[in-house]
Amino acid sequence: YWVEYCNYKKGTYYSDLRAKNGHPEPYGVKIWDLGNEVDGLPWELGHKNAEDYVEAAREAAKAMKAVDNTIELVGSGSSYYEPSNKWFDWNRKVLEGIGDKITYLSIHRYWEGGSPDSFYNYMGNGARDFD
């Protein structure tokens, strides 16, 4: 409903609610995230495996684009970067499953500091997933 509230012109429940709340014109939000750190077991409420996330994200993308087909969507990349490299599989499955629906993939790598070279090496290791 957020896309309708933020972007639909008028004449629907949520676009009219936006106007009633003091903003008659659409906000025009163009980039929307299809979840945040969805692979975050156990810390993320509502976490999913990649297959379940892809299914839910495809349905959400369809509904969101039906309201505003000009928006760009961001897929939830992995946030769980542990030594086994299972996150590579998450990102690949998401790209294979909803790559046709998203413009971006949100990668959540958290650098713990150090030299600029260590930053580029750390971040660059994630790029190999897209080779």
Task: State each model region's role.
Residues 6, 12-49, 74, 103-114:
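Active-site groove signature of glycoside hydrolases
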Residues 49-131:
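Noncatalytic carbohydrate-binding groove/subsite architecture in carbohydrate-active enzymes
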